[in-house]
Amino acid sequence: AGFEDGFSFTITVPSNYQPHIDTAQVLKEEFKKIGVDAQIQLIEWDSWVSDVYQNRQFQSTLVGVDASNITGSAMLQRFTSDNAKNFINYSNADYDAAFEKAISSTNDDEKTQYYKECERILSESAANVYIQDLPEFVALNKKYTGYEFYPLYIQDIAKLRLADE
């Protein structure tokens, strides 16, 4: 496996976000094993937002996807060709048609089938590669109890109480 003649590309990451820098370094080493030269370009956060995210000037990047709204439409809409948040410039007419049918449908089973079609298209075209889910760290003074972790990023302090001393 690998690329006999190899190739090179640049991973552009914000210089102020260590998890992305660390991930880029791991990817660089892994790509080297298959004959691919990945260069890491560190840029300031403001430049990353304007050049990479907004103006889509990059070969490759790492990004944390906001999953605060995990409805099918919210997660899949970002890949429609004309979506402002489609910063990877993904464009696929079949995907766009399936997504439009999904959001237009009033039948939940039909909507689900169209969303599955969208996911199949994304998977087959490798629109994105999800590589990690960063852990959540919480520092809590030991005088408090009742903090709960949730599968999504939620800070619910309703059950937080002073511990019995």
Predicted feature locations:
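Ligand/substrate-recognition segments at binding pockets and active sites
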Residues: 1-67, 136
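Alpha-helical interaction segments
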Residues: 69, 85, 105, 119-120
